[in-house]
């Protein structure tokens, strides 16, 4: 098989096929994204939901890579409470690293001069992720069982096969990444094409396979960065990784098909298939739309209030006193985000001493929180209520092994 050494071998970089379908999906996504951001009125509730989505993002990114970590394990890891089981502890470390890098990435994107397509940015994501992992997780193995050390932030320095695809010669990676940056980061690309650009860039970066390991994580983080940069991340209220994990087989099949060469004279003019790249972009945008619509339905306020009520009616049966009153306070916090302690009397109709008991009960249960002993009460979404407030947010999907490279 020929070894790719010139960036022209990854043409086309944008598909010409299925233009009408991609335009239709773009319009639908922009409309759905606007509806989603209007679902949450309280800035504090928005932040709390975004925190849950960030945990969900690492949960699904881990699943795509063949690692399963429960939401409660992630919550414990955030409190530095690690499992004694080595595999579970490693998965917790992977989750922590992902969450930390995503937060860092969001902060860095506040600087408009940061080029999300730049090789330096990609290497930064890779370095920040791996430097947060313990030394045993700095090793990977090929499908032949050969172990090799992962160098944080360093481009691949060996040849590799990924499935049926042989990525470019490692010596040519700087040239490929420079072409990737200059084309996709071109300021002259119309905003109406940006979603297709994000989808196509996702595949072409996977095709380049710039790192020895960790490519999938970096590529998904970079796609998330692009959505944030172009105002399409819904203030952190949805994540692409949930859809990609849900349709993992379709995702990998679409990636692999788009690796294929041109299929005849009617399939574009580049080295690779235009039609297959268009199919991947359609899949990618359909996944985006599905996830935005899913979260929009989940955050519909009347429906969310009902799920809060049902949690207290059917799940919090261990609460023998003040369950109804605690439900009213919690429901109000889901609406408003924050209330004063004095409001509890008004909401429950109880005396001050009883209201104090209700507040203590809610704090002990974790259904709301406070910044200080006498501070206001704030909405909280601990892991134990995720499946009740946000059903199907964390799908119990089977763990499948990732595609390993051969060297």
Would you name each region that the model predicts?
Residues 1-407:
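FIC/Doc superfamily catalytic core
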